């Protein structure tokens, strides 16, 4: 599903806002997809470490660009919505997730953050409970007056699935608690399956011709979430208790005491848990558990550290979806050796050419791996990876496993270095490598089949042509039926299908009225402003802001296309000139001279116009439009107190939304940026302003409140 190779190799700190926003949107979709598979269908497509890497990258993007954070971002939510097949249970105390630590430095950071929060001068002596992180399905058990009243999965953290009937069939979970138990007790823990029972279950499933499970976690989750409790009753499920939710009385003063109390009430708790009193002891525990991991009867994917004293847990509290007083220290990825059969080239939805290793199937960490990413041409050359090599494969932080090294002593004598293609294997267009970049990219953006659906989705999106009723599902359907293959095809659809409308209705499943409404929506977009037209073409690095700069500079579509074609011709004639645009040509130098564009963006625009397929598609599109409206300079910018100034908005504004604030500023001739730099003139801060305000203070920039900003733009020349 993923095509994040375009920018994932780029450090977050060097991304533009447009790049970050595009990657952020893709990551949100990707993570939502995998959460639905993991929590809703118990059928994950990727390793836990790969999923962790996606969330880690998303968190990094949002830390660098706080304006990208939305309430439904995976960083602000937990798990996935409950399935429609079960009743819903609202958790009285939310079932939150845990932050992850991957290195000793991460653990140091976790402990030091706690010390700073609690204002402790010494971190040694602060007690933690360390316990294995069971790889299973989270479960909450509610007991009322000693009797099991309800059992629910975690779901999205706020609402889970009612699996009470199924849980009553699990022998390790008591139906009644002994005397002295709290009148209300929610026990939280993990449903799991020991490996020996998992293998036996898979043998029985295979003999019966039924589905076999990829790993014990999937087997446990799938067994618990059966609609028929009698199926669950036949599955060897186990349960570890490690926490609690709603309580009528405390279980103890510390995490350790509470675990012992749960054990006394009849629940199994991890025998491998340990009380630790320093960072060194935490890391020793991690190393010991890791070394003995294979000998454990159940799967674990790391260890969990929790502050022992419950009063300190309460003081530390929670972030949006994770407690400050706990973290999960994950184990590194697992490795195996296998044969590299072939190297194939995949073309992603934005044109990135990604090499993929086709492998002799091998089991890595319980999952059969037959393909692995090779990232890019540089990685292949650096590691000298060749077809026929024996390679080491790792399940790590990528969407598919990766090849980490070559076993050169087993290399065939007749092997040859891999030659990376210079043309797209999908459409034959030139594949161009960006200056100072690692990714080769197909330049046939408007015609390449591998990019077509994503390009068309972008073309009709809200800030481009904004064609109502032509969403991703319809685009995919029309593309699969060979009805829409290029932007121009959208505007010829009615002409081509009008005489066979009934057939179109029958083949698409749309109602006649729906199709007629779509035709009207398409016709309504035959006129479009120049900046939206430029943005709609999906040229790499040309986001909304850059499209507006181009529209302001060239004013009309004719001059713009002519000058871009001229710049592309100049660049093609001078491909090696890397530092002086004026030596390339007049049109190219003019393009590079536009503020905030430069050679990198100019080269991507030139690559687009240098490809004949794109020019043909562009000509065909222009023939179908009534007009691409000339750019009209913003009114009353002359004399405006903010004309020519660079403005950054941060935090929540009270009197207007971010889009309105941006539009008003631009109408006054200001440039609205997404990040703070030394070139920023004004930083307007609303409620809950974050890192941008802090950076503005560090740089000594002018910081305005919302009211001060409104007062400023209300001066003569304002709107």
UniProtKB/Swiss-Prot annotation:
Keywords: DNA damage, DNA repair, DNA replication, Ligase, Magnesium, Manganese, Metal-binding, NAD, Zinc. Its EC number is 6.5.1.2. One of its GO terms (biological process) is DNA repair. NAD(+) binds at residues 48-52, 97-98, 131, 154, 190, 306, 330. GO terms for cellular component: cytosol. Signal peptide: none annotated. The keyword Nucleotide-binding does not apply. One of its GO terms (molecular function) is DNA ligase (NAD+) activity. SMART domains: BRCT, LIGANc. It catalyses: NAD(+) + (deoxyribonucleotide)n-3'-hydroxyl + 5'-phospho-(deoxyribonucleotide)m = (deoxyribonucleotide)n+m + AMP + beta-nicotinamide D-nucleotide. The active site is at residue 133. Residues 637-719 form the BRCT domain. Transmembrane segments: none annotated. Zn(2+) binds at residues 424, 427, 442, 448. Pfam families: BRCT, DNA_ligase_aden, DNA_ligase_OB, DNA_ligase_ZBD, HHH_2. Its cofactor is Mg(2+); Mn(2+). Belongs to the NAD-dependent DNA ligase family. LigA subfamily. DNA ligase that catalyzes the formation of phosphodiester linkages between 5'-phosphoryl and 3'-hydroxyl groups in double-stranded DNA using NAD as a coenzyme and as the energy source for the reaction. It is essential for DNA replication and repair of damaged DNA. This is DNA ligase. It comes from Rhodospirillum centenum (strain ATCC 51521 / SW). The gene is ligA.
């Amino acid at each position: 599903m993923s095509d994040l190779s375009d920018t994932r190799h780029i450090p977050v700190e060097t991304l533009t806002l447009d790049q970050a926003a595009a990657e952020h949107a893709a990551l949100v979709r990707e993570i939502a997809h995998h959460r639905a598979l993991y929590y809703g269908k118990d059928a994950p497509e990727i390793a836990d470490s790969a999923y962790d890497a996606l969330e880690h990258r998303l968190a990094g993007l949002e830390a660098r660009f706080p304006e990208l954070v939305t309430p439904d971002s995976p960083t602000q939510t937990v798990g996935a919505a409950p399935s429609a097949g079960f009743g819903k249970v609202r958790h009285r105390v939310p079932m939150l997730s845990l932050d992850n630590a991957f290195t000793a430095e991460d653990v140091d950071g976790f402990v030091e953050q706690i010390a700073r929060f609690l204002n402790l001068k010494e971190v040694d002596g602060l007690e933690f409970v360390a316990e294995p992180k069971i790889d299973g399905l989270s479960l909450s058990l509610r007991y009322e007056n000693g009797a099991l009243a309800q059992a629910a999965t975690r779901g999205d953290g706020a609402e889970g699935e009612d699996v009470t009937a199924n849980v009553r069939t699990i022998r390790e979970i008591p139906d009644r608690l002994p005397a002295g138990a709290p009148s209300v007790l929610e026990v939280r823990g993990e449903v799991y399956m020991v490996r020996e029972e998992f293998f036996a279950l898979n043998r029985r499933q295979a003999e019966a011709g039924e589905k076999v499970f990829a790993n014990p976690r999937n087997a446990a989750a799938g067994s618990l979430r059966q609609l028929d409790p009698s199926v669950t009753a036949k599955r060897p499920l186990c349960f570890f208790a490690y926490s609690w939710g709603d309580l009528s009385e405390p279980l103890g003063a510390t995490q350790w005491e509470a675990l012992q109390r749960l054990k006394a009430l009849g629940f199994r708790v991890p025998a491998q848990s340990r009380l630790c009193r320093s960072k060194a002891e935490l890391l020793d525990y991690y190393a010991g558990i890791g070394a003995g991991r294979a000998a454990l009867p159940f799967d674990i994917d790391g260890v969990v550290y929790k502050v022992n004293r419950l009063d300190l847990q309460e003081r530390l509290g929670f972030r949006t979806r994770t407690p400050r007083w706990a973290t999960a220290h994950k184990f590194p990825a697992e490795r195996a050796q296998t044969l590299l059969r072939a190297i194939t080239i995949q073309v992603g939805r934005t044109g990135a050419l990604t090499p993929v290793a086709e492998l002799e199937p091998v089991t890595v960490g319980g999952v059969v791996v037959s393909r692995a990413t090779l990232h890019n041409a540089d990685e292949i050359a650096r590691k000298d990876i060749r077809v026929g090599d024996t390679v080491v494969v790792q399940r790590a932080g990528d969407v598919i496993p990766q090849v980490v090294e070559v076993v050169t002593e087993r290399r065939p004598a007749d092997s040859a270095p891999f030659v990376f293609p210079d043309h797209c294997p999908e459409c034959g267009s030139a594949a161009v490598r960006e200056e100072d970049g690692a990714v080769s990219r197909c330049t046939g953006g408007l015609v390449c089949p591998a990019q077509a659906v994503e390009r068309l989705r972008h073309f009709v999106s809200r800030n481009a042509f904004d064609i109502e009723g032509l969403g991703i599902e319809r685009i995919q359907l029309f593309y699969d039926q060979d009805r829409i293959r290029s932007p121009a095809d959208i505007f010829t659809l009615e002409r081509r299908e009008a005489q066979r409308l009934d057939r179109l209705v029958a083949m698409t499943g749309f109602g006649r009225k729906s199709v007629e409404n779509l035709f009207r929506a398409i016709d309504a977009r035959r006129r479009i402003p120049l900046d939206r037209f430029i943005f709609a073409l999906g040229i790499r690095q040309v986001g909304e802001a850059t499209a507006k700069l181009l529209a302001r500079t060239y004013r009309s579509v004719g001059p713009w296309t002519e000058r871009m074609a001229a710049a592309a011709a100049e660049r093609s004639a001078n491909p090696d000139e890397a530092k002086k645009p004026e030596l390339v040509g007049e049109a190219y130098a003019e393009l590079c001279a536009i503020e905030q564009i430069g050679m990198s963006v100019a080269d991507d625009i030139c690559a687009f116009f240098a490809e004949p397929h794109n020019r043909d598609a562009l000509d065909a599109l222009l023939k179908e439009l009534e007009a691409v409206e000339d750019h009209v300079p913003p009114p009353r910018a002359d004399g405006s107190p903010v004309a020519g100034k660079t403005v950054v908005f941060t935090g929540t504004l009270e009197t207007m939304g971010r889009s309105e604030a941006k539009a008003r500023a631009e109408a006054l001739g200001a440039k609205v940026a997404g990040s703070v730099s030394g070139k920023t003139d004004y930083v307007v801060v609303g409620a809950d302003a974050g890192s941008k305000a802090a950076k503005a203070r560090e740089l000594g920039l002018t910081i305005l409140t919302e009211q001060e900003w409104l007062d400023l733009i209300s001066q003569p020349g304002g709107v």
